[in-house]
Amino acid sequence: MLLMHKVLLRILFLIPVIGYANDPFEEINREVWTFNEGVDNRIARPVAEFYDDVVPIPVQSSITNFFSNLDEIDNSINQLLQGKPVAAGNDFARFLVNTTFGFLGFFDVASIMGLEEHDEDFGQTLGVWGVPTGPYLMLPFYGPSSPRDLVGRPISGVLSGTFSIEESDVRLSITALDALETRARLLDVESLIVGDKYTFIKNSYLQYSEFEVQDGEEIEDDFTDDMDDFLLDD
């Protein structure tokens, strides 16, 4: 989704000035990282590159919109749990509009109507409730995570539209396509990675998690201050 791309670009600018050291399992995490990189290099990235080369951009955008729409119920429920009823109503309205007028969400009519897109999950809700992120974890196949997200992600998975599909073959196929679409969206971002890739991904993940919990407010202020300092120094 375009929202995630915008956020990731902001995070990439912040990585050099904000560091994280909450990685007590770094030795094991790096071993898992090496394994994941091997799987990605041999399978995930080539398939994602093929998808990106073969599937037209408008079709890719429609697929992205479809999966974003499946997450709107999860978004709206977590907005309520975080004490944001107006945002919850916005996200539920997005689901209704895009499902009805956007052909099951393949077209983002809601954004055209001025309904803002959000990205919420139960891991963020736990963060809003004061649950700490915990130590950084690198999971086999899955990638970056934390104890808080290990609890939150499965619950958000149950709240997503995919979980409600009864046919297991269809559900697995949609889940696989979702993973492929997500990997393809990250191809453009990879070129911006500098230095030790493991450390960069770790800091990006932790910073992005904090950004989501804060709704970008505190980090936006930090970003603005850093840019002001940079411009003044020049």
Model segments located where?
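Surface-exposed patches in mature extracellular/periplasmic domains of secreted proteins
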Residues: 59-62, 82-92, 111-112, 191, ...
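Mid-length scaffold segments of soluble, non-membrane domains
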Residues: 69, 82-144
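A structured, mid-to-C-terminal "fold-capping" secondary-structure block
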Residues: 23, 124, 129-234
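Short N-terminal segments immediately surrounding and downstream of signal-peptide cleavage
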Residues: 22-36
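Helix-loop segments that flank and shape redox-cofactor active sites
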Residues: 50-55, 78-88
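N-terminal, post-signal-peptide region of Sec/Tat-exported proteins
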Residues: 41-75
